[in-house]
From Swiss-Prot:
InterPro entries: Phage_T4_GpT_holin. The gene is T. GO terms for biological process: viral release from host cell by cytolysis. Pfam families: Phage_holin_T (PF11031). Keywords: Cytolysis, Host cell lysis by virus, Viral release from host cell. It comes from Enterobacteria phage Ox2. This is Lysis protein.
Length: 39
């Protein structure tokens, strides 16, 4: 799931935050699906 262009990108940080949301709440699932649509 690493970004193909650069080693560090906002997407990597975002995925890290979403990963925490997945473990904390099911709300992370909704956020992740919205982000997936945006990306």
């Amino acid at each position: 799931m690493a970004a193909p262009r650069i080693s560090f990108s906002p997407s990597d940080i975002l995925f890290g935050v979403l990963d925490r949301l997945f473990k904390d709440n099911a709300t992370g699932k909704v956020l992740a699906s919205r982000v997936a649509v945006v990306i």
